[in-house]
């Protein structure tokens, strides 16, 4: 038997099934469903409800990236290893950069792995909407899943690189101290800052395609704006306050300090990085969800 619900009944029905939605009856049978709180407006509950879809997209992206290649998943390790050999040859032997007591190959491989994670997360997240325009125009799902997929794919690559990093630490006899307890916080901060930057660029690149043209150049320059291939001791002391205003510099140096026992970043720079992280992530989510309704038409 078919039952036709009146607007009042439908409102009551929907109100009980969606804790993150508010039902507003505007009269004449028109019912508007809106998020009932700020978290709902950011789209986070919808992403959690569709976490199985996020897992599917992540696995599909990883397979699609590496399976068609000859080396397959070996590229996850070979790419940072190849760059590491180049920088060790240039900075270690030609320039003579010293990172004592940390062996230079371990120093560079950790820095390159972190840089590739940062660069990959920002670039992939920024271009995720444009690259997935086809499926987004045909099927509805929480759009935030698209940039989150880019984040988690790069997280998986970074975790694979850390297997090599741990191996190098064992080979060279480098062991972390008590400050390793801060490692997850610095690494999580790096991931969230990278995602926030990519999310902001993704929201604005739909209307401003010049962003995607300039982004590869900016990412190549950023490797020298962070302590990835050179020690922090090479930065002139009078420029250190300006240098640490870059949140990526303090986060990467914090990872080096917590894992390898290098010089700790100033705590004021860590605090400023945390503030910028919160502001950037919130703004990125707001900008993304604000344009979510119209982004498909603009792609």
Where are these regions (language model features)?
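Hydrophobic transmembrane alpha-helices and immediately adjacent juxtamembrane helices
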Residues: 2-299
């Amino acid at each position: 038997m078919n039952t036709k619900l009146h607007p009042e009944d439908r409102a009551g029905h929907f109100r009980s099934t969606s804790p993150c939605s508010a039902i507003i009856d505007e009269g004449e049978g028109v019912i508007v469903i809106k998020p009932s709180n700020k978290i709902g407006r950011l789209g986070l509950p919808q992403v959690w409800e569709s976490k199985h879809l996020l897992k599917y997209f992540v696995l599909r992206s990883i397979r699609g990236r590496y399976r068609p290649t000859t080396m397959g998943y070996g590229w996850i390790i070979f790419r940072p290893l190849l760059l590491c050999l180049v920088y060790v040859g240039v900075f270690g032997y030609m320039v003579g950069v010293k990172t004592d007591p940390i062996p230079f190959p371990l120093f560079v491989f950790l820095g390159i792995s972190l840089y590739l994670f940062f660069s990959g997360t920002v670039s992939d997240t920024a271009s995720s909407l444009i690259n997935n325009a086809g499926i987004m125009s045909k099927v509805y799902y929480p759009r935030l899943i698209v940039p989150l997929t880019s984040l988690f794919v790069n997280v998986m690559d970074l975790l694979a690189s850390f297997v090599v990093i741990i191996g190098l630490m064992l080979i060279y006899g480098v062991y972390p101290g008590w400050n390793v307890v801060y490692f997850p916080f610095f690494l999580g901060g790096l991931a969230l800052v990278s995602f926030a930057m990519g999310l902001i660029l993704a929201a604005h690149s739909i209307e401003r395609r010049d962003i995607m043209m300039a982004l590869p150049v900016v990412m190549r320059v950023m490797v020298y704006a962070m302590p990835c291939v050179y020690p922090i001791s090479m930065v002139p002391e009078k420029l250190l306050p300006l240098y640490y205003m870059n949140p990526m510099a303090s986060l990467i140096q914090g990872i080096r300090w917590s894992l390898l026992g290098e010089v700790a970043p100033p705590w004021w720079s860590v605090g400023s990085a945390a503030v910028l992280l919160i502001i950037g992530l919130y703004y990125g989510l707001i900008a993304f969800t604000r344009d979510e309704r119209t982004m498909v038409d603009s792609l």
